[in-house]
């Protein structure tokens, strides 16, 4: 029996990483059962030292994440040392910005135990609008990211926008782009919960769901408070259940993000029956109907926002007060999200030896 070793990003209650930690093993097991596949043993490689705190404006804590990853490397090393890793086993690293990839490939090559590595890419230095891209304007990060890319057999991206940006900004040779695949992410477990909230009574409020960080332009959301009841969830300290209730009771979800490779909070809102108002850029441009996209220029900077604010306010107001005009487009968006972005079957196929994706 082959083994899939899951190398998770540390689970943080306020982030989807906690849901991933709990649900990815279930998703893999359900896929195996549904298709009647040969069973895999699924082992999660936990780390130590993580906590629920995050560095301000970031997805995780920049110090304790290294403790967590280092202890994962220790555990993986013991598995190789004790003969628990066999030829043909798989590693799924759920955040590819993880030096465990280096250790896995190092041991696999030098101990002559061929394994397959799958890495899911999220944020990184390769995106100049991400916090890593803004804070680490150094020579070493792109070399590190390219090394991890080449060490993986499969690199997974949530959107075509994300994949294209990665390959372009890291100047990946064309002959090596076959390692980069687009797949939705493993979030299907949230679909029933959010659809059940779609009948929640909607209030005349605009929800802004992002981290309070420069790449999300919170100052624009603050400026919109002169025209709307704007709820900035980052300031509220909500747990996941309370956050979903706040989300589902809003008429509009608004983004002015300069950086977005997928946008989980927007998908959560749309499934809850909330109308999205999004810039025509980043991943939004490929994921959502034109009815929900305003010109990117309107919020490409705070200066531009102030210039175009009247047009943006009217754009939001129309969708808030006349939701019936956008019901059909909202249904299309919901179907697209569920079928293409909240499921990861394309990633699971090679992970489970279903030969529909060729590296």
Please identify what each model-predicted range represents:
Residues 182-226, 230:
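Conserved donor-binding/catalytic core segment of Leloir-type glycosyltransferases
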Residues 1-103, 358-359:
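N-terminal pre-catalytic "stem/leader" segment of glycosyltransferase-like enzymes
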Residues 275-278, 285:
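Short hydrophobic beta-strand element within catalytic cores of glycosyltransferases
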Residues 90-96, 109-131:
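Active-site proximal beta-strand in glycosyltransferases
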Residues 299-358:
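A charged, aromatic-enriched C-terminal amphipathic alpha-helix characteristic of glycosyltransferases
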Residues 258:
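Aromatic "clamp/platform" in nucleotide-sugar-dependent glycosyltransferases that forms part
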Residues 134-155:
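Membrane-proximal helix-turn-helix segments that form the acceptor-binding/catalytic region
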Residues 150-195:
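Donor nucleotide-sugar binding/catalytic pocket of nucleotide-sugar-dependent glycosyltransferases
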């Amino acid at each position: 029996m082959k083994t899939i070793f899951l190398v998770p990003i540390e689970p943080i209650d306020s982030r989807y990483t906690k849901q991933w930690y709990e649900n990815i093993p279930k998703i893999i097991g359900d896929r195996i059962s549904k298709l009647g596949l040969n069973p895999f043993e699924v082992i999660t490689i936990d780390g130590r030292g993580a906590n629920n705190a995050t560095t301000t404006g970031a997805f995780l804590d920049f110090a304790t994440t290294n403790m967590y990853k280092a202890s994962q490397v220790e555990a993986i090393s013991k598995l190789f040392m004790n003969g628990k890793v066999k030829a043909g086993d798989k590693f799924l690293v759920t955040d590819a910005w993880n030096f465990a990839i280096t250790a896995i490939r190092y041991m696999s090559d030098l101990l002559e135990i061929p394994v397959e590595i799958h890495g899911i890419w999220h944020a990184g230095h390769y995106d100049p609008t991400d916090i890593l891209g803004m804070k680490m304007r150094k020579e070493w990060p792109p070399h590190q990211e390219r090394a991890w890319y080449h060490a993986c057999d499969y690199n997974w991206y949530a959107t075509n926008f994300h994949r294209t940006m990665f390959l372009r900004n890291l100047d990946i040779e064309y002959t090596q782009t076959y390692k980069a695949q687009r797949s939705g992410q493993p979030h299907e477990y949230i679909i029933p919960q959010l659809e059940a909230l779609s009948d929640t009574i909607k209030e005349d409020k605009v929800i802004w769901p992002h981290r309070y960080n420069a790449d999300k332009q919170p100052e624009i959301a603050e400026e919109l408070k002169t025209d709307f009841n704007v709820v900035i969830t980052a300031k509220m300290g909500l747990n996941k259940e309370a956050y979903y209730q706040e989300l589902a009771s809003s008429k509009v979800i608004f983004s002015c993000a300069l950086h977005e490779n997928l946008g989980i909070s927007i998908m959560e809102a749309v499934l809850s029956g909330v109308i999205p108002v999004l810039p025509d850029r980043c991943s939004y441009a490929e994921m959502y109907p034109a009815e929900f996209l305003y010109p990117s220029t309107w919020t490409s900077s705070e200066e531009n926002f102030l210039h175009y604010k009247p047009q943006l306010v009217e754009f939001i107001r129309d969708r808030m007060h006349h939701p019936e005009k956008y019901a059909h487009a909202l249904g299309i968006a919901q179907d697209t999200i569920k079928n293409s972005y909240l499921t990861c079957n394309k990633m699971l196929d090679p992970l489970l030896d279903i030969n529909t994706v060729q590296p």
